[in-house]
């Protein structure tokens, strides 16, 4: 009885509360560059105890504070593609070299904002869940993120009052507005003991947002870029598929669907019909490139990043739960397949107008060399969207905001267009992953969007202009290493908040110990009383109950005794109840193509697939919106 009581106590929420920021601190990272280590935290946070659902995060503290604190939550897409893409190939402070050493990203977004990368939904990247418990809809994705943030801010309260921005790319164009709406609703119904989360803006790059506007844009883009020539046999076949797609898009209820199978076949067939005699096809993420997988092995950094993240010492540095370090893959097609099994929620295009009208700024940006979520589709959805009393970029009826040419450090970079709290930026010569191609330009863009004031930071300003007019100063990658006076004041506030958080965690841990000792003492007292009545001696027999049934008293009790047995029992699952990310390197090598062999990712299909369609693209792969 006593053993079971103590196990119940240790598994209570109080024990979970005892976890603190210190448990997630990253002391060092393999291959780190010379110089002081950036302040980082990483690890798993439980979001669903019933399904063993845990989300992995990697957090980087900002290097400077410009007038106020900001946090950017970054999500990659898929669904089922890891946000480590964003951390190590796009906006994070490090890039991985061939020899697994890390170099600084000169355009990292952590210069003036805290960065929080989260692998989600559960089962993505380093996150995990029981294999029969993958998510199927966007509402559950948003609910898990709210749970994650509640727990994360409880451990890191110094960031809870930061201006909050949510950013990402591709299928995150669905995640981000749904999560933002959940935050807005939470703020409206806030409880007395909760803090308001100041959500300020959303940034979506080459996002999948509006099926009605973006499916037809695939063929439009192919014609515009000369991938397909109108009037040819290939064009006629594709036109027929597009006609069927258009019928589906206009069918009753189609406006509430994120995935439409018939429309997805346009891109699949386009890639098949344009494959060359030497088995090369267009890279759907960058049409300037061709390979046998249609972009599945792109970008080039993916190989070394995958090997790096599978290293045991990297997993240990990132505080991964036991057994979770070996199985990282960029995109988990089991997450993708399960997400497509049912109606996964309304398209995010239905949420954007309300979010903008509630005061949340939105920035959409596109690389003009991307096919799979191309800029024509994004421009079409903006043109047709109605919000704040107007349609598209109207400034007044019949008058649209102009496109303003953008130059960065003397080169034509793209253009800006803005109206009524929505900004659109087109990047010239950029792929699906714009920050991968142009980290400094995207840093300039994000600093302007989040209203960074660098007056007290120092460093030569970047030369960024719209229509030749010099913009307010930003300093991309050139800030001084010293901390400004504003930094010092805010640093003191952060340390005070951190100390309070650690104190709170310590108090919770002390409560656990006190209650545990009290319960233990009560049962010992009861045992002695019973022994006195029965005339027996309260010897070791009274203490045997501390151990679980069937566990020998001679088992080790050194620091890991009872607790380690409790963990082993709670973490053991039946052979059928495997965890989504719980496999080792040997198992990875034996996976079939349907289960993400090596570094290839499953091409994403917006809609369901037939079994006999597995070979539609790139030797059995469909394009991921990663």
UniProtKB/Swiss-Prot annotation:
Biased composition (Acidic residues): 607-616
Comp. bias regions, Low complexity: 474-486, 564-575
Biological processes per GO annotation: apoptotic process; proteolysis
Membrane-crossing segments per the record: 505-525
Molecular function as annotated in GO: serine-type carboxypeptidase activity
Cytoplasmic compartment residues: 526-626
Membrane-protein topology: Single-pass type I membrane protein
Signal peptide feature range: 1-18
Family: Belongs to the peptidase S10 family.
GO cellular component annotations of the record: membrane; trans-Golgi network
Residues modified by glycosylation: 106, 421, 429, 478
Annotated protein name in UniProt: Pheromone-processing carboxypeptidase kex1
Pfam families assigned to the protein according to its UniProt record, in alphabetical order: Peptidase_S10
Alphabetized InterPro entries for the sequence: AB_hydrolase_fold, Peptidase_S10, Ser_caboxypep_ser_AS
Key words of the record: Apoptosis, Carboxypeptidase, Glycoprotein, Golgi apparatus, Hydrolase, Membrane, Protease, Signal, Transmembrane, Transmembrane helix
Family annotation (PANTHER family): PHEROMONE-PROCESSING CARBOXYPEPTIDASE KEX1 (PTHR11802:SF190), SERINE PROTEASE FAMILY S10 SERINE CARBOXYPEPTIDASE (PTHR11802)
Function: Protease with a carboxypeptidase B-like function involved in the C-terminal processing of the lysine and arginine residues from protein precursors. Promotes cell fusion and is involved in the programmed cell death.
Keyword Chloroplast: no
Catalysed reactions listed for this entry: Preferential release of a C-terminal arginine or lysine residue
Lumenal-side segments: 19-504
């Amino acid at each position: 009885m006593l053993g079971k009581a103590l196990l119940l106590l240790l598994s209570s929420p109080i024990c979970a509360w005892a976890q603190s920021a210190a448990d997630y601190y990253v002391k060092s990272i393999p291959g780190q560059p010379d110089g002081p280590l950036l302040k980082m935290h990483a690890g798993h946070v439980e979001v669903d105890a019933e399904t063993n659902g845990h989300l992995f995060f990697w957090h980087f503290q900002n290097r400077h504070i410009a007038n106020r604190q900001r946090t950017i939550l970054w999500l990659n897409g898929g669904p089922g593609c890891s946000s480590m893409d964003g951390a190590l190939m796009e906006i994070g402070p490090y890039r991985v070299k061939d020899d697994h050493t890390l170099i600084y990203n000169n355009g990292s977004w952590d210069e003036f904002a805290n960065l929080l990368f989260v692998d989600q939904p559960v089962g993505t990247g380093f996150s995990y869940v029981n294999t029969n418990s993958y998510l199927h809809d966007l509402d559950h994705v948003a609910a898990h993120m709210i749970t994650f943030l509640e727990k994360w801010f409880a451990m890191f309260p110094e960031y809870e009052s930061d201006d909050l921005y949510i950013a990402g790319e591709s299928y995150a164009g669905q995640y981000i507005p749904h999560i933002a709406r959940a935050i807005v609703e939470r703020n409206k119904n806030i409880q007395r003991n909760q803090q308001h989360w100041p959500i300020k803006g959303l940034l979506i790059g080459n996002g999948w947002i509006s099926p009605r506007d973006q499916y037809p844009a695939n063929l439009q883009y192919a014609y515009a870029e000369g991938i397909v020539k109108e009037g040819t046999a290939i064009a006629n076949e594709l036109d027929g598929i597009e006609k069927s797609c258009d019928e589906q898009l206009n069918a009753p209820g189609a406006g509430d669907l994120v995935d439409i199978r018939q429309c997805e076949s346009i891109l699949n067939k386009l890639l098949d019909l344009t494959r060359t005699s030497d088995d090369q096809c267009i890279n759907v993420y960058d049409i300037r490139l061709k390979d046998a997988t249609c972009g599945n092995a792109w970008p080039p950094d993916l190989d070394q990043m995958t090997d790096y993240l599978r290293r045991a010492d990297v997993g240990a540095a990132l505080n991964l739960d036991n057994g979770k370090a070996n199985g990282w893959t960029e995109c988990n097609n089991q997450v993708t397949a399960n997400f497509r099994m049912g109606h996964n929620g309304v398209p995010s295009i239905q949420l954007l107008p309300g979010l903008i009208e509630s005061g949340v700024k939105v920035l959409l940006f596109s690389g003009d060399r991307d096919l799979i979520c191309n800029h024509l589709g994004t421009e079409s959805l903006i043109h047709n969207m109605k919000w704040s009393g107007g349609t598209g970029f109207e400034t007044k009826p019949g008058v649209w905001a102009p496109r303003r040419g953008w130059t960065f450090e003397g080169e034509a970079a793209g253009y800006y267009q803005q109206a009524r709290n929505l900004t659109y930026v087109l990047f010239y010569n950029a792929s699906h992953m714009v920050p991968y191609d142009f980290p400094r330009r995207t840093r300039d863009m994000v600093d302007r969007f989040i209203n960074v004031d660098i007056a007290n930071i120092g460093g030569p300003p970047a030369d960024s202009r719209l229509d030749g007019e010099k913009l307010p100063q930003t300093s991309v990658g050139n800030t001084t290493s010293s901390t400004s006076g504003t930094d010092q004041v805010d640093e003191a506030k952060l340390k005070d908040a951190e100390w309070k958080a650690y104190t709170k965690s310590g108090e919770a841990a002390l409560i656990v110990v006190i209650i545990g000792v009290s319960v233990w003492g009560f049962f010992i007292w009861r045992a002695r009383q019973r022994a006195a009545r029965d005339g027996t001696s309260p010897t070791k027999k009274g203490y045997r109950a501390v151990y679980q049934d069937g566990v020998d008293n001679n088992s080790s009790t050194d620091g890991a005794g009872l607790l380690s047995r409790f963990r082993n029992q709670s973490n053991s699952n039946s052979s059928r109840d495997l965890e989504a990310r719980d496999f080792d390197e040997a198992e990875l090598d034996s996976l079939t193509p349907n289960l993400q062999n090596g570094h290839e990712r499953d091409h994403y299909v917006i809609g369901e697939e037939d079994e006999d369609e597995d070979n539609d693209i790139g030797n059995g792969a469909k394009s991921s919106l990663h």
